[in-house]
Each structure stands twice: as C-alpha cells, then as structure tokens.
C-alpha cells in the first residue's frame, strides 16, 4: 500500500487490510476489520466499519456507509459481516448494513452492480450480479435479488421478498410479494404486467421463446382452476422452454411471501 494513495485526513484503524493500488480520499474512516481488495477507490467521506470486505475495482462515492450494524432492535452485537464483490459502483449516500443472527450473519452483494444515490440494502440481503438499483431504492432485511434485475427509483421492497433474475420493477413501486424471473412489475402496489421482454431481448434471449414464456405466465396467473394445478399443467406443456422452466422452478420454491399477480 502506497501512502501517496491515502489522503492525510483519512482515519484508518490499525488492523485494516488493503490490497494493491487502493485509493482512500479525504475524510474517509476505515474500521480495524475492513478488507479492501486491489484497486478499490473511496472518493471521500466514506465510512466502512465492522467485519467488511470490498472486492477489487469497486468505487465508492462520498458519504456512503458500509458495514454498520443492522437496524433491528434484537441485534445483540453479534459479529456479523458485510461482503461486497468486485467491480461495483456505489454512489453517494448508499448504505449497506451487516447481517444478523436471524439471517445467517452475512449481508452479501455480488459483482458488477450499480447502486445509485441513496440506495439502502438492509441486513442479511443476498444481492446478485449485474444489477441496477436506481436512486433511493430501499431494501428491507433478508431480501434476495437475482442477477440482471433492475429496480426503479424510490421503490421499496418488503423484508424476505425475492426478486427474480432479469426482472424489472418500475419506479415508485412498493413491492410486498415475490417477483418472478423476467417479470415486469410496477404500480402504487406492485402488480405483474407481463415479462421484461425488452430486457430479455437485450440480453440475447430468443424472441420466440420469450413470447411463448409470456403465454405460459398468462396461463399460470390468469387461467381457470387451482393455481398449483395450473403450474403443473404449464410445466408439462412448456417443458422444452428454458425460460418457462426457470419461472416454474421459482414458483415451486418455498417462500414466506405471495407472488405479484396481474391486476384484475
């Protein structure tokens, strides 16, 4: 670690570990159990504390706070941690809080994500890769977000909710139910509007397969009869469509939340 990369006003506790070419800007505060991997850059006024690891090439902007204790009354100073992957862009005023005993003790963020101004990632969240969270997205505790999802600005997600891969949530959406992979949801109360067809096309999914998957989803959520029976019928009918299979697998997993449905 070169001292020339550390601003003289930064406060770095003894015990903090830095990789190669780490840059720490003015007035940053780094705790004693923080690990910053190669090429991490802290612009200024960044606070990183707790048992926290930041992956290589991640850039963190002013007034972000990473690794502080979870905002829960039952937190008892357990030694939980925050793990953030590589190549993330974490903009101003983002908060990522440590895990808790009730959630596996780790808040985990993947790679190649963009978290815009004011994003909050609560305790014990499991955040995937290649995500975009727009300004002031707020995630409560224990939320799982799959790869390539996009969450629009000022949206809030209820604790324990799952957000499926490649889905898109429109801005200002309160999300209190699971969002299926590829789902497109928005509203004052998030409802399913179809599949994220534009995003799927951009990611190289076959257009015909995507449209077939949309038909399958409509049969599941808008068809007649028992919901569980419809899932089984659609699974058999579209068993050769990998997108449908991925959605069916998601629907069959255990969850404490309901699913976002089409507006009736």
UniProtKB/Swiss-Prot annotation:
Coiled coil: none annotated. Involved in the biosynthesis of lipid A, a phosphorylated glycolipid that anchors the lipopolysaccharide to the outer membrane of the cell. It comes from Rickettsia prowazekii (strain Madrid E). InterPro entries: Acetyltransf_C (IPR029098), Acetyltransf_C_sf (IPR037157), Hexapep (IPR001451), Lipid_A_LpxA (IPR010137), Trimer_LpxA-like_sf (IPR011004). The lineage of its organism: Bacteria, Pseudomonadati, Pseudomonadota, Alphaproteobacteria, Rickettsiales. GO terms for molecular function: acyl-[acyl-carrier-protein]-UDP-N-acetylglucosamine O-acyltransferase activity. GO terms for cellular component: cytoplasm; membrane. CDD domains: LbH_UDP-GlcNAc_AT. The keyword Repeat applies. It is found in: Cytoplasm. It is an enzyme of class 2 (transferase). Homotrimer. Keywords: Acyltransferase, Cytoplasm, Lipid A biosynthesis, Lipid biosynthesis, Lipid metabolism, Repeat, Transferase. PANTHER family: ACYL-[ACYL-CARRIER-PROTEIN]--UDP-N-ACETYLGLUCOSAMINE O-ACYLTRANSFERASE, ACYL-[ACYL-CARRIER-PROTEIN]--UDP-N-ACETYLGLUCOSAMINE O-ACYLTRANSFERASE, MITOCHONDRIAL-RELATED. Belongs to the transferase hexapeptide repeat family. LpxA subfamily. Pathway: Glycolipid biosynthesis; lipid IV(A) biosynthesis; lipid IV(A) from (3R)-3-hydroxytetradecanoyl-[acyl-carrier-protein] and UDP-N-acetyl-alpha-D-glucosamine: step 1/6. GO terms for biological process: lipid A biosynthetic process. Its EC number is 2.3.1.129. It catalyses: a (3R)-hydroxyacyl-[ACP] + UDP-N-acetyl-alpha-D-glucosamine = a UDP-3-O-[(3R)-3-hydroxyacyl]-N-acetyl-alpha-D-glucosamine + holo-[ACP]. This is Acyl-[acyl-carrier-protein]--UDP-N-acetylglucosamine O-acyltransferase.
């Amino acid at each position: 670690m070169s001292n020339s990369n550390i601003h003289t006003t930064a406060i770095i506790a003894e015990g903090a570990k830095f990789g190669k070419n780490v840059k720490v800007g003015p007035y940053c505060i780094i705790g004693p159990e923080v690990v910053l991997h190669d090429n991490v850059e802290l612009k200024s006024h960044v606070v990183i504390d707790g048992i926290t690891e930041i992956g290589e090439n991640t850039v963190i902007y002013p007034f972000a706070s990473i690794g502080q204790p979870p905002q829960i009354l039952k937190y008892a100073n357990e030694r939980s941690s925050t793990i953030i992957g590589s190549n993330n862009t974490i903009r101003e005023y983002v908060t990522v809080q440590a895990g808790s005993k009730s959630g596996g003790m780790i808040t985990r963020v993947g790679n190649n994500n963009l978290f815009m101004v004011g994003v909050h990632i609560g305790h014990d969240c499991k955040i995937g890769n290649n995500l975009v969270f727009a300004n002031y997205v707020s995630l409560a505790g224990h939320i799982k977000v799959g790869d390539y999802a996009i969450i629009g600005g000022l949206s809030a997600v209820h604790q324990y909710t799952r957000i499926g891969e490649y889905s898109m949530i429109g801005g200002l959406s309160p999300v209190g139910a699971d969002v299926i992979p590829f789902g497109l949801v928005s509203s004052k109360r998030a409802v399913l509007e179809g599949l994220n067809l534009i995003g799927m096309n951009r990611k190289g999914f076959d257009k015909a397969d995507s449209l077939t998957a949309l038909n399958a989803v409509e049969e599941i959520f808008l068809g007649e009869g028992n919901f569980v029976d419809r899932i089984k019928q659609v699974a058999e009918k579209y068993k050769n469509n990998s997108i449908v299979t991925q959605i069916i697998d998601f629907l069959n997993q255990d969850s404490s939340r309901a699913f976002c449905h089409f507006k009736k």
